Every structure is written in structure tokens, then in C-alpha cells.
């Protein structure tokens, strides 16, 4: 056979299978386009900061992984549907070598359309994506539509490698099976499946374990360490329940003769048993992808929309100055510098918060705070301990509290009361004179990444003694230990004026302190100065969430489409059989529709259940980013679920029409 004949056959096959190949090529084009655009952002000369480029580089790595998985997965639908066609070619005299040449030409055509189409769209839509990213980051980007040659070459090489691997996989599938097996390759799953009780039970246990971990997670650090394990349990449990659990439930319904031998239940249950065997993995994939979309979009939207709340939590005052290894002369000098700059800019300091403190880290065991300077505890009882002299507390709160030796006032950011009369710092005992319900030092918030316990002591002497006893055991160098053993001076305040004015004042204070107090380790952080870095981080995360969320959504849509097409071809014979045994068209349509509805909406329902179960642990993870506005996260999650459910329903209705065209 000549090369022209192979080419004609390949083109004819692509035309005849356009219902399955066009969506596949569109998915490939989309993957190439998204990869090229993000690659340009990560590597191009485009005015983006190093931090943003780092996030884009990480995102590009994720796109590489998901592109391989999704293209191989969608290809499996294509090759399954074409096995019968290839088997006919084989029986009619085409050797497997000839079939391989034909498939190779098809792969070349598909690859070039996908890669060049994707790169072209990447160049066209790249400018729009840069503008969107610039808007999210709150800075102007000088956009030039240029072809990034290194990115183009990398994109071409990467996706060409994927298509070569897919071709080799398809050729292997054809090579290892006989012509008869090829003819019946798309009819797999017609035998009634056996009940795999062990897999169903293991799936239920794994899912329950994942849910339990999500519900019992303590503080955010605890959530960080356990979240991955919970995700693995839920993913494996989902596959187990879809593959074995669904069939087990249906078989139980089948054994219930009173329920099963009703006309509307008989056909539905029988049909569902067969459907679940061939659809279980695909439905589990839809469920997991849907869960990923819902969580990714809702969390990144929440972080971006709630950015002002996050900044307020991270920086309670507009400007915060800390001096380590402080002394009275340095404190006076720093305070004078701050006052001069504020007066110079015609503004005024408000809500001032000035005090000295010593800081420790430990964990609470009963009424004993066990301190260790070289460990950062991540269990539910971990806490940061801040020791403050009584004089500073009285000045800050405008009170006149008194304390005897060995007495303390206690304030915790946790809403739960300490409720004991004594507290030990290692082996040093203190009597709790009063536990404070509120304080200007901080606010009650259970979602802080690390709970803070404030202890107000009679004066600086017991504080310095505790610091010395604790940090003498530290393995850190002498200079670091000396800094930790000393008191820290903290001065924070708000200002009147515009954001630009506040930013200038903060920058001037930072510059003046570095120039005029160089001998002291001094840090200055400002709400307005750090706002740009917040926009970069959360804007980039929001862009990544929406970008990857869109990709996962498109893959979900594609899987639903292929499922509907596969269901249509599989149900074509069933449709005729049900009519031949006496059911009219309306009854047949109603029976099949009920099965299809159950099949395709089960993943959405399970995804929503997964999100609800993960809600608590996700709020703990968001607290790591200082996002403690739970109401906002609830609103973002509900809005995301509603939008996704609407899109899911629209996709189902559109693909359902194609299903009925095939069946009829």
C-alpha cells in the first residue's frame, strides 16, 4: 500500500470519528495554549517579579503533570471506541504493521493541529492573560505580543513527546490483542460484575478515615501535617466506593425482591449494575476533579477577596517597629525618629501600642507550659508565650492593676478559658491572679496559626530570669541566644491619611532606622509597604486557582461528554431490546434517563459531600495565610458550588442531546 492510501485512510478515519476526536483535539489545543502562556510568564522578559515568576514556574510544572495525565486518559476513550473499527481493518486484510502506519499518520495530524493551534492561540490570548494577571497584581505590565522562542521550543518538544508516547501506547494496545478481541473491545463490561465486598469495605473505611482526620484536626500546623494523608484516604476511598461500593449497594437492592420486582425499579437497578462496572473509574475521576475545582477555586477566591482582612490580621497596626536587645537610650532615639517623620508628613499617630516583651515557644500539658527554644510544636496544645511587664500593660490598657511576686495576669487568644489558679513555666510556678477576657494586646481567635498566651508579670526581672533559664539550653549560637534572652521593644501605631502617604511614612521610618540606628537589630514592617507583596502572592495564587480550575473543569466536561457518547453507543442495543420486550418508547426513555441522571449526578453530589467534610481542615489551612474570616469562606464556597453545579447541568443537558441522537 502506498503512503497516499495511508494518508487518505487516516484523514477519513479522523472525519468519521470527529465526534470523539474534535473534543480530544480541543483539549490538547487548550493544554498547549495554557502551558505556552504560563511558560512565557515564568521565563519571559515581561516585567513580572521573581516571586510571581516562581509561582508561574510551579504552575507550569503542575500543567505538565496534568497535561500528561489528562491527554492519556482521554486517549483511552478514543482507542476503546476504535478497537472494533481497527479489528475490522485487520480482518479485511490489513496487517498490524499497516494499521500502525495509519495510526501514526493520524497521530502526526492530531499532534500538529494541537501543538500549532495551541501555540497560535497562546500568542493571541497571551496578551489578555498578561492584562488579567497585571490587574490582579495591581501593577502595570508593559505588554508586548512577542514569540518567546525558548518557551515555544520547550512547548513543542514536550507535547510532541506526549503524542509520541500516546501513539506507542495505542500501538501496544493493538499489538497485544487478537482481531476477535479488537472487534469486541468496546463491548467490555457487559457481564454482570461480582460484588467485591473487601474493596467496598476498605473504600468505606478509607473515606471515613479521611473525613475523621478532617473533622478532628486541631490547629493549622496540625492541619498542614495531616491534610495530605486525609486527601490520599479520600481519593482511594472514592475509587473504592465507586468501583465496589456502588455495585454492592445495587446487588443488595436486587436481592430485595419486594423492591426489585417493580417495573420502574427492575430495569433501573439491572441497568445500573452493568453501567457501574464500566463507568465506575470514570465517575470517580469526575468526582475527584470536581472536588479539586470546588476547593481550588473557592479557597483562592476567598484569599484574594479577603486580602484586606488578611493584611489587617497580619498587621494589626499601620506601622510596627521591633527592637531586639533594647535599652532605654535606643528606645528614646527610635521613638523620636518616628515622631519627627510623622510630624514632617503632617499626619498623626493613633491607637499606639508600646510595650516590652520576652517571647517563648512551648506546649501546654495540664497546668504546665513546657518550654523548648529549639522546637516548634505542631500539636493542639502548642503555643507562643509572650511575657509582658505590668507597668507596660497598665499604660497600654490605662489601668492600675497590681501584682505580688509570683503572680501573673493571663490572656489567651483561644476562646477556651484556662480555668486554673496556677501555671508553670517549666518548673517555675506562678499564681494566676486573673484571667483576662479581652485585651488591647490581641483578640480572641481560635484560628490563629499558633495560639498566643500573654502573661503579665510584676516587672522585667522574672521575665529576664525565665528567658535566661530557657535559652541557655538552646543549641543556637551565642549571639542569637543573647538576643533571645533580652527584652524586645515593640511600638505600633495607625496613621491618618491616604494609602500613598502611609506608605511613604513607613518607608521613611524604615530608611531612617537603618541609617540612624545601625548598631541595633531593628525591624520595621508596614501595612501599606507589604500590600504590594500580598497582591503579588494572593493575586498569583488566585490566577493559578482560576487557571487550573478552568483546566480541570474542561477535563471534567470532556469526560462527561465521552461518558455520554460511550453510554449512547452502549445503550443503543439495550434501547431496542427493551422495546422488543414490550416497553413503549416513553417508558424506555424514562428508564434510561433515570439511570443516566443517577450516573452523572452522583459524582457532583459526592464532590459536594467531600467539600463539606473538608471544610474544617481547609479553614485551618487558610489560617496559615492569616485568613480567619470563616463567613467569607462559606460564601465563596457556596457561590463556587452553585456556579459549578449550573455549568455541570448545562454540560449534561447539551451532551444528553448527543446521547439521544446516538440511541435513536
Please provide the spans of the model-predicted regions.
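N-terminal Sec/SRP start-transfer signal
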Residues: 1-32, 192-197, 206, 242-290, ...
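Short cytosolic juxtamembrane segments of multi-pass membrane proteins
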Residues: 3-5, 176-190, 569, 660-664
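Hydrophobic alpha-helical transmembrane segments of multi-pass inner-membrane transport and secretion
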Residues: 19-45, 51-87, 107-121, 201, ...
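Short helix-loop junctions at transmembrane helix boundaries
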Residues: 40-50, 119-152, 208-226, 603-664
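Hydrophobic alpha-helical segments
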Residues: 109-253
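Alpha-helical transmembrane segments and their immediate juxtamembrane interface regions
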Residues: 228, 232-252, 309-335, 624-663
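Basic-flanked hydrophobic alpha-helices used for secretion and membrane insertion
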Residues: 310-324, 329-554
